[in-house]
Amino acid sequence: MYVVLEGVDGAGKSTQVGLLKDRFKNALVTKEPGGTRMGEHLRHIALNENISELARAFLFLSDRAEHIESVIKPALKEKKLIISDRSLISGMAYSQFSSLELNLLATQSVLPDKIILLLIDKEGLKQRLSHKSLDKIENQGTEKLLTIQQKLKTHAHALKEQFGCEVLELDAQKSVWDLHRQIVAFIECVV
């Protein structure tokens, strides 16, 4: 089963992924972008080089293609639980070029079975961002991140409608352990 955690920076994805790694010891825990060695190089170029937005989008698509081919598909073949910090959903939400068709090509139509969306309101986001050093995206402000969050929701629900991916939306401001319990129950509930 392929499970992805989605949410804007500061929503608590990394915290939950860490807890899930401890809970599901045999799971493959990965991330996007940068879930492969090549992906780390592509991510570095995409985030640090002065390149066009279109070139940046294609670097992230290349990273996604390599990640699916070398990490996700082999783990699915072995029937492993896969837990990924981000996926094509973030790729489409953060990019100016959010083509589902190109992402389906990059993923070879390998899509998550379950999508966990950690959603946060403006005040909660401001509070969390005030406690950390901000990266390039976070420095664009809470309004930009809230716009991205809406795109995350839109893309996740589009995958649900078109491909049957299950979606769980959670209030990221709830306690870490309440969220963890709900996420574990969602993962363990195999219909």
Swiss-Prot record:
Pfam entry (one): Thymidylate_kin
Catalytic activity: dTMP + ATP = dTDP + ADP
Enzyme Commission number(s): 2.7.4.9
Residues annotated to bind ATP: G7, V8, D9, G10, A11, G12, K13, S14
Keywords noted in UniProt: ATP-binding, Kinase, Nucleotide biosynthesis, Nucleotide-binding, Transferase
Disulfide-linked positions: none
Stored CDD domains: TMPK
GO molecular function: ATP binding; dTMP kinase activity
PANTHER family: THYMIDYLATE KINASE, UMP-CMP KINASE 2, MITOCHONDRIAL
Family statement drawn from the similarity comment of this UniProt entry: Belongs to the thymidylate kinase family.
Function, in words: Phosphorylation of dTMP to form dTDP in both de novo and salvage pathways of dTTP synthesis.
Annotated protein name in UniProt: Thymidylate kinase
Gene source species: Helicobacter pylori (strain Shi470)
Primary gene name: tmk
